Amino acid sequence: MGLLQEKLAKYDLPQKFMAQGVYPYFREIEGKQGTEVEMGGHEVLMFGSNAYTGLTGDERVIEAGIKAMHKYGSGCAGSRFLNGTLDLHVQLEKELAAFVGKDEALCFSTGFTVNSGVIPALTDRNDYIICDDRDHASIVDGRRLSFSQQLKYKHNDMADLEKQLQKCNPDSVKLIIVDGVFSMEGDLANLPEIVRLKHKYNATIMVDEAHGLGVFGKQGRGVWDHFGLTHEVDLIMGTFSKSLASIGGFIAADSSIINWLRHNARTYIFSASNTPAATASALEALHIIQNEPERLEALWEATNYALKRFREAGFEIGATESPIIPLYVRDTEKTFMVTKLAFDEGVFINPVIPPACAPQDTLVRVALMATHTKDQIDRAVEKLVKAFKALDIL
């Protein structure tokens, strides 16, 4: 056994939970992801999906992808920088830019590669990056790849953000990067106050709208629109893998920023471009959410009903203001156990443990879709109450 294998062989935490029968990852789904999914020959209530708009199984989205494959083929066989740009990519970028009120947008192969490529491309040794300490892992990795000076502020603590800004050279670039919706806890960034501090300290703001797009604001434009900050956020990032029912991501900003990123973001230049099917499906989903406001209304009706039911049942759900509802467990082993008990009762939820959260903040994450019914929510709450009580969590 080589040194690398010897080192990695010591990692046996997954095997420990497998032996206990509570390992919760890589569960196989045998069909489309809707509010109920086929798993192991059984129907399971799906409350672990990020498909907030409920469009992953929509026939219009599927058909758009099929038509694109027939026209363009299965892949582009190159990066956007070389032979991998389709007119379809350009159309999606133009429509995304218009949707979020920016000059231009760039599409990346995944949401993760947006953040991990854009952040180091924008900053150098003389610049500062300031992040919320609960920002997504892709933001964390993006700043790790940057040569900039890096600061973190306590979660949604605006006094601490100001303290970090005061440490910066006033004549240097200061890039504040924040999740619009925090993906595990479901709470929102305090964008109005961040914007105030932006102006006070001459900073730049980048907002990750992965969980805000399709959910907040007019037609689901995002948290920035929810707060009425149309021209105050400098860079808007989003993904296609959630509300847009596909795979990929984008960054939108003014033309000078996009021109720089188009020629300097390494994950854009050196990655194969989005597949025709993924691009066309995202474009069709974007059209649907703009043309069907009732879908956003249904999402919030389901969300508000679920929030009410979970609160009434006595769950600790924190400060969530979104379709992401954390049910706090505060114990890693019990988090896995309650996930297994819920699954055995026919409810799919996701466990959240370190490093996705602090050790004392472990939880199971419930996520709502526009297509969830009150009956499905009631059944899920009933089963989760049973699972939590069995472990003396509730």
What is each residue range found by the language model?
Residues 235-237, 244-293:
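Conserved core segment of the aminotransferase class I/II
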Residues 202, 209, 222-240, 259-263:
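Conserved active-site segment immediately N-terminal to the catalytic lysine
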Residues 6-74, 203:
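N-terminal "arm"/small-domain region of PLP-dependent enzymes with the aminotransferase-like
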Residues 79-83, 93-117:
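Short loop-beta-helix segment that forms the pyridoxal 5′-phosphate
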Residues 297-304, 311-346, 356, 360-361, ...:
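Conserved PLP-binding catalytic core of the aspartate aminotransferase-like
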Residues 118-137:
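Conserved PLP-anchoring active-site segment centered on the Schiff-base-forming lysine
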Residues 59, 63-67, 71, 98, ...:
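PLP-dependent enzyme catalytic core of the Aspartate aminotransferase-like
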Residues 151, 155-207:
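Active-site phosphate-binding strand-loop segment of PLP-dependent enzymes
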